[in-house]
Regions:
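Amphipathic alpha-helical interface elements
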Residues: 1-171, 177-187, 191-223
Length: 223
């Protein structure tokens, strides 16, 4: 409660009101980020499946080890997604329509984490070393596959897309850990979510902005 008490000048009633506001804001942010993540992973996955099909003849880059350099960029996180998908399948009720079925590519895809998608993109952090092999591999994947996932962005080196995804990933982690949003420019980051989705499909962006309640809750911050 420390950040809320500080913001409320040690007034416990105001601090609790701020805490409740932050929780409600976090829930609305999480909803928007969750939808955005689905759109982003589906768009990137479509291009990665096509790329892996060209490289290996097998479109699934999740169920089996993909071609290099995608293999090295995703190896640990890909295996973790498979493990979670297999665990989920093993927990299916006998009455589940897919009881006993093998996991599919889509099962594994649904169990990927947002951080994996950021890690595949060209790294534009200020202290990045472009000559490192993994960074060259990220650039290669962008040029050969992932740039096409964002057809409405003029982003030849992936700089804009990387920072949009990075900002969303940071906010996603903050919200999932129930960290304070008191000093976070939530509307700016949510704007990145809308722009990112718009770079995939303008219709999806219009739909997403129509569902937003983040701005309404953000504006209702207790004084």
């Amino acid at each position: 409660m420390a950040p809320y008490l500080f913001a409320a000048d040690s007034n416990k009633k105001r601090a609790l009101a701020l805490y409740r506001w932050s929780v409600e804001l976090g829930a609305s942010v999480q909803e928007t980020l969750g939808i955005t993540e689905v759109f982003v992973r589906n768009a990137m996955n479509d291009q990665l499946q096509e790329w892996n099909r060209r490289e290996t003849g097998n479109p699934s880059w999740l169920l089996d080890a993909p071609a290099s350099p995608l293999r090295g960029l995703t190896q640990g996180k890909r295996r973790e997604a498979l493990r979670r998908a297999q665990k989920s399948a093993g927990n299916r009720s006998i009455h589940h329509p897919r009881y006993g079925d093998e996991i599919t590519h889509d099962d594994a895809l649904a169990n990927t984490m947002f951080g994996m998608w950021k890690d595949i993109l060209p790294n534009h952090d200020p202290d990045v070393v472009p000559e490192k092999r993994e960074n060259k591999n990220r650039v290669r994947m962008w040029e050969e596959a992932l740039e096409a996932a964002f057809p409405y962005a003029v982003d030849p080196d992936g700089h804009t897309t990387y920072w949009r995804v990075s900002h969303l990933h940071l906010l996603c982690n903050r919200v999932s850990h129930m960290d304070s949003l008191l000093n976070v420019d939530v509307l700016d980051v949510i704007g990145d979510a809308f722009s990112l989705v718009g770079s995939i499909d303008a219709v999806l962006e219009q739909w997403l902005t129509g569902t937003r309640i983040v701005k309404k809750i953000y504006s209702s911050r207790p004084q």
